[in-house]
């Protein structure tokens, strides 16, 4: 599906390149930088699945590889430090480049390293999971976890380019595919109900071209939102639908039990229930959300982990989206979204939350 989307950024513009030929597209992106040093950051899963691809990289470029353990706990300052050590040992300068090839964890981690090493070096993202292709690679957000706090340290640092190839999705486990669908449903439910309906009816096994169209549509939606509100002062906040609770679940579960898209699905259900209770969203819309989550085997309750409403509320207080005295939730409405500000001392809300979990 060779196409290109151009993203306008206040930091720097970049292209999202859709391709079936990753090596050629990467070579085109690098241009004169082909002669510079490249550090490929990936994880063990991707490295073993695509070892031939990495061997071709090594033949064509002055390339080094940093292979991370898989999983969310890799997004740590300890891993950042290990990558810094490798960059310094190989004498990387601001003229050299990082290429991330992996899911959202690798993209966020590698982007953060690029943003901070030598006060910023260029990088290219090659996302290999559905979630990273439609969500985490788009918009320039990079960062790592701090202790148990999700994405607490980070920046907005756009890449030189993002290379999207659905070929990578052929090796993606169903659970990870559903996590990507979760983020696509999020943007569809808030901003593009026709997209939501198409995802509800989509048949993965028989419609590869349909998947490519849905990916392109999801990315186009996020591109438009990011271009209007890159630094999350208004419209881009809508993309945090499900994320206040979702990030708290990830933090308390130490990024085990629930993958990101699963935690966000639970968060979306609770946000939608809150919206229904306040008369902002028809119950039929909540029912539709629950049905499509069930279809994609996404969780809608916290049955896998012993997590209390009180412990979740305590984590909410550290959320980076908060204002000084309030915890911020994004609630879906019949026509879009609104924000709900909960006082950090509102212990009655804990009881309300407990009834919704």
Curated annotation (Swiss-Prot):
The protein's name: 3-dehydroquinate synthase
Tree of life domain: Bacteria
Ligand binding (Zn(2+)): 183, 243, 260
EC number: 4.2.3.4
Keyword Amino-acid biosynthesis on entry: yes
Annotated catalysed reactions: 7-phospho-2-dehydro-3-deoxy-D-arabino-heptonate = 3-dehydroquinate + phosphate
Keywords assigned by UniProt, alphabetized: Amino-acid biosynthesis, Aromatic amino acid biosynthesis, Cobalt, Cytoplasm, Lyase, Metal-binding, NAD, Nucleotide-binding, Zinc
Organism of this sequence: Streptococcus pyogenes serotype M49 (strain NZ131)
Record-listed NAD(+) binding positions: 104-108, 128-129, 141, 168-171
Keyword Metal-binding: yes
PANTHER family tied to this protein: 3-DEHYDROQUINATE SYNTHASE (PTHR43622:SF1)
Location of the protein in the cell: Cytoplasm
Pathway(s) the chain acts in: Metabolic intermediate biosynthesis; chorismate biosynthesis; chorismate from D-erythrose 4-phosphate and phosphoenolpyruvate: step 2/7
Catalytic EC class: lyase
CDD domains recorded: DHQS (cd08195)
The family this protein is said to belong to: Belongs to the sugar phosphate cyclases superfamily. Dehydroquinate synthase family.
Cofactor(s) demanded: Co(2+); Zn(2+); NAD(+)
GO biological process terms held by the UniProt record: amino acid biosynthetic process; aromatic amino acid family biosynthetic process; chorismate biosynthetic process
InterPro entries tied to this protein: Dehydroquinate_synthase, DHQ_synth_AroB, DHQ_synth_fam, DHQS/DOIS_N, DHQS_C
One CC-aspect GO term: cytoplasm
CC cofactor note: Binds 1 divalent metal cation per subunit. Can use either Co(2+) or Zn(2+).
Designated gene of the protein: aroB
A GO MF term: nucleotide binding
